[in-house]
Amino acid sequence: MRFFLDTADPDEARRVRDWGLLDGILLRPEAAEMKGRDARRVLLDLAQVGDGPVIATLAAGDPKAMYKEARELHKHGKNVVLRVPMTRDGLRVVRLLGDEQIATDVGLVFTATQALLAARAGSAYVSPSVGELDDTGQIGMDVVESIVRVYDNYGLETQICVQGIQNPIHVLDAAALGADVATLPFPVLDRLFEHPLTARGVAALRGPLSDGPRRIH
């Protein structure tokens, strides 16, 4: 499983890159705005952090407007992937961009049938949001499981990016189901390192060293 970092902070992306865990980035426009920065400037900065895909979200609108915005955003880097909404017009844009070898990710996906349509349209990625599904009383991972099964049945190459990840259990479940990517915020990724027994073992390893060299009798 690969990790895409859900962030608008280039410093977070660099930290994860230095850990050897940065496979891609998802930039949400609202996240950039919350930091008081222009989303396109942030996109340019993130695209230079690594070679992996950087997913930029298109504003929903008519196909011509989305297509025009997509081509403009793609100029920020060859690794920029354009996220389109799961709508009829969105899938038209997927097809148009695919003809120009511009990769897309279909978002706002909440059923396996929607994911099937995204794959048939030629999207490189599809992003079901488990957190939002869980918040409505559904089990988000059940949808991911269905998508994995459908894609396996037909040999579909669209990669499944599980997003809306809220905790390490979501990461484990997504990995166990065979999803290609976990798209997660920095705090959740950081928590994957932690376990009380690991902390105890690290403390024990530090103990003898902190006492200084011991004299051998």
Task: Mark where each language-model region is.
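Active-site-adjacent beta->alpha loops and helix N-cap segments on the catalytic face
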Residues: 33-46, 62-68, 84-100, 111-119, ...
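Glycine-rich phosphate-binding active-site loops on the catalytic face of alpha/beta enzymes
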Residues: 29-32, 108, 124-136, 178-198
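Glycine-enriched alpha-helix->loop->beta-strand junction motifs that scaffold or abut catalytic
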Residues: 19-24, 51, 76-80, 96-104, ...
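C-terminal alpha-helical cap/extension of soluble enzyme domains
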Residues: 151-217
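Surface-exposed amphipathic alpha-helices with a cationic face
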Residues: 17, 47, 74, 91-99, ...
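Conserved, mostly hydrophobic/aromatic
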Residues: 28, 82, 118, 174, ...
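Active-site beta->alpha loop and helix N-cap motifs at the rims of alpha/beta catalytic domains
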Residues: 1-14, 19-96, 130
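Catalytic cores of alpha/beta
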Residues: 11-19, 65-73, 93, 111-121, ...
